[in-house]
């Protein structure tokens, strides 16, 4: 489960991390623009189990430093890529869990083909997460051929009934007659 902690752009909060941790047994990902080791220490203090490191905002040395801090705290790292150059860097850096962001952060457009094109280039030992733009069960089913998991936010959070929204994305629209 990912929790937004960036306050400036996404109205997130580190306070979300322990709140989610109390009600969900799954590992909690701190989703933020992490650029400083302090943010990782803070995330761990607030009970995050993993952190997001975006190659679009980090150079290789920054990534190595931040990943080392996370690993020293027994935290997982989700390495985010959004294009071929970043994918090659993730491979060279030895990333074990790679998130492919289907959203172009420059214009916010969505292209699910990004997961279809980039995921096959990752090795068998790499866990692939498809991020952003996933709204339907059909998309989850089709992309599951390329990804081991999904980060789905807007499609769920825009609904009043979160439980029903999760069921729709995971199971589809199933009418039960009786």
Residue ranges and their predicted role:
Residues 2-78, 84-89, 115-118:
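N-terminal active-site wall of soluble small-molecule enzyme domains
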Residues 25, 74, 94, 125, ...:
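A generic structural signal for alpha->beta connector loops
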Residues 115-122, 158-178:
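C-terminal helical cap(s) of enzyme catalytic domains, especially alpha/beta-barrels
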Residues 35-47, 82-94, 130-152, 164-169:
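Catalytic cores of alpha/beta
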Residues 42-62, 99-108, 146-166:
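Glycine-rich phosphate-binding active-site loops on the catalytic face of alpha/beta enzymes
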């Amino acid at each position: 489960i990912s929790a937004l902690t960036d306050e400036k752009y996404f109205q997130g909060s580190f306070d979300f991390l322990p709140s989610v941790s109390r009600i969900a047994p799954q590992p909690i990902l701190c989703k933020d623009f992490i650029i400083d080791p302090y943010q990782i220490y803070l995330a761990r203090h607030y009970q995050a189990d993993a952190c997001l490191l975006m190659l679009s905002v980090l150079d290789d040395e920054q990534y190595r430093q931040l990943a080392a801090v996370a690993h020293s705290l027994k935290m997982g790292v989700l390495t985010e890529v959004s294009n071929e150059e970043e994918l090659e860097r993730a491979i060279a850096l030895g990333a074990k869990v790679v998130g492919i962001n289907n959203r172009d952060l420059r214009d916010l457009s969505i292209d699910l083909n990004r997961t279809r094109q980039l995921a096959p280039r990752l090795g068998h030992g790499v866990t692939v997460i498809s991020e952003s733009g996933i709204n339907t069960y059909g998309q989850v089913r089709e992309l599951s051929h390329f990804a081991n998991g999904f980060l789905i936010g807007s499609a769920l959070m825009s609904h009043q009934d979160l439980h029903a929204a999760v069921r729709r994305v995971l199971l589809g629209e199933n009418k039960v007659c009786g």
